Amino acid sequence: IQFSFGSKTALVLHHTPMIKASARANLSLVREVDASITDQDIDLALKQVGLNELAQSPAHKLSAGERQKLCLARAILQKPNLVLLDEPTANLDPNTTEQVEEMIRQFDQSDADLLFSSHQLAQVQRLAEYILFIDHGEIKEKGPVGPFFLNPQTAAAKRYLQQELIAE
């Protein structure tokens, strides 16, 4: 994994603060970083995440899933090289989780690299190609997702997978 600190990075958190203004106004804040963003760009980003009907709704009153989609719209506007997603579907219902995962897959089709954290093993299998398994703040294992799940190499990874798979 290579990353240049000069690259454009978008951050999508599962608890992102919103200003007490419309969803559209929250996206307009991206103009402070990139003045080339137009009203049409904002409208397109809202449409891409399915929030065009809620553009004038107060962002702080949107549901958790709608707020997450708004965060993804913000990332779309930034045209980043790298998107960091922290637990992108935490606390979302299954339908909204599926919608957000589809949006993440669309990002994956762009030139942006995606790096996401997740404790949801099924989501990791659906979305990731490569895994860094971290235990107590230390990378214990890294490599393609398939082999990690089929044949974990470290005791920590084996223990975690056994606990999680039994719990699921």
Located regions from the model:
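Helix N-cap at the start of a conserved alpha-helix in ABC-type nucleotide-binding domains
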Residues: 94-95
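H-loop/switch region of ABC-family ATPase nucleotide-binding domains
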Residues: 118-119
